[in-house]
Every structure is written in structure tokens, then in C-alpha cells.
Amino acid sequence: MRCFVYVLVCVVASVSYSRAQLPGAGGPGVFPGGVPTIGPVIPDPTRTETCAKFWVQEGDSCYLFDSGAFLRQVAASRPVVVNNQDGLFQAAANMYCGQMHPNATLVTVNSLAENNFLYEWAVRMMVEPEPVWIGLHVGPAGLWQWYSGEPVTYTNWEGMVAPRAELGLGAMIFDADIIAQMFNNQVEITPQWVPEHGRNDRHSLICEYHPSGMTAAATNAPTTPPMATAPPMAATTRSPVMFQNNPGNLVNRLTGGRFGGSLLHEIPRRQRMRPSNYRKNPYFGIQP
């Protein structure tokens, strides 16, 4: 009997200790120094790095890849909970960037090199595919513009066709679709941009700011985008590859496409004029 009581006491103590390690499992004092919080990064004057804490420098910019989530406590007697675990709408995401660092906005992508850097940097950190807001959106004047105010000199729209500027539209990157293969299913994460209404869904985000003295101040006037894209591809008569009918593993052979990522670009469900119907056709239409 004594042995049973001893074991029971040990089990209860172990469960209590485990609960104490969980965020929000108790009030202040459970964690050394109180409950951890995720809030704006306060500039540290003693910091020697160019970018603020948690930000990464590439070229003349500092970037932050963020889920948009933060911790809050509804009441002193209630546990700490995570807000916005599914991300933020685009306008809220841009405001969030400004809270994370002065003068920061959703990222402005000015070149293919910058686009490819963001693709490789962010995708390496993803546990699962996650669409991400960038700063391109349709402003009050009905024109595509960046939240930073910089002119639109480069775009990388999926399909190489700029979508019609409609109020409320924004741009996201890293849209993903499942690609059916012979031995397993893989996910194609596109480095090209996809239009999405800013309040349709919540996404993660990439923020950007330029350290003082590294770039000229941006202008805030909306600009009419030239919609520059990569040079047009040569005309081809090849028909779309039906991947499940092809005996070869094409994804392992076709890597490093002109837009970054794979040379295989799956026709997205939302895109018109696709060679095969994603929902009705048992085979996925693949556009080499």
C-alpha cells in the first residue's frame, strides 16, 4: 500500500511539473522572470550588428520573417494565449511590421535576385508550406504600389501577366500546391506572386526596413507600375506534361528555374486558361 501511495505521489508531481513547463500553464513565477512575451523589438544602442535583433541583413535591407502571432493575457487570473496564430490580413500585417521596427513595412521586392533570396531564406525556415504577404497592393488611386512608397520597377506575377488592379487586392508569395509523383507526393512552393484580396485570408509576412544611411528615403506617392518582368520565354509547341503518365521523376531533373525554385510550375487552381482542370482531371497539369 505504501508503495502504491508513493508511486501515485510521484505521478502527480511529474504531471504538475510538466504542466508548469507549458506556456500559459500558470501565472507569473512559473517561468524564471515571469511569462515570456513577443512584442516590438526595442532598439538596443549597444548592439553592434547593423540590423535589429531577430532581423537578418542582406544587401542594404534588414528582413524579418514573422507569423504575426503574439502573446497576451486576457486577465491576471487567466493563462497567456497566442493571438493571430493563423497570421494577419495584409493591411494589419503592414501595421505589424511598423510595430516591430520604426519605418519597417511589408517587404518591397525590387529584383529577381532579391525575390530568389527571400524564397530560399524563408522556405528553409518553413515547417510546412505557408503563403506570405509582400507589400504590393492596390492603393486608393487604383494602382499597384508598395507600402514602402518605392516605385514599382519589378514584378514576378505567376503566369507573367499582371492582374487587373482592383481595390482590396494584395500580393502574396510562396503559394503551394501538391504535386502527385510516382512514389510520393511533394509540394511545389512557387516563388512567383499570386494576387489575393487583402482581407480574404490571414498569412505570415516578411517585413523590411533600410538601416539609416544605407538608402535614400522612399517617396510616398503612388506610382503607375511599369510591370517589368523577366524576358518573355521563347515560343514552344510542347504540350503540358501529364506527370503521372511520365515514367521519369521530372522534379529531380528539372531544378533551378528562371523564376527560382523548380522548372516545373504547376498550373494554380485559381488561374484561368489552364491546360488541365485541377479539380476534375485525375492528372495534374504541369507547365514546364
From Swiss-Prot:
Residues that carry a glycan: N103
Keyword flag Iron: no
Entry comment describing in which tissues the protein is expressed: Spines and tube feet.
Signal peptide: 1-20
Keywords, ordered alphabetically: Glycoprotein, Signal
Keyword ATP-binding part of the UniProt annotation: no
Every C-type lectin domain range: 93-163
Disulfide links within the chain: none
SUPFAM superfamilies from the UniProt entry: C-type lectin-like
Pfam families xref list: Lectin_C
UniProt cross-references to PROSITE patterns, sorted A to Z: C_TYPE_LECTIN_2
Main function: Matrix protein of the sea urchin embryo spicule. The function of the matrix proteins is to direct crystal growth in certain orientations and inhibit growth in others.
Name used for this protein in its record: 30 kDa spicule matrix protein
Protein species of origin: Hemicentrotus pulcherrimus
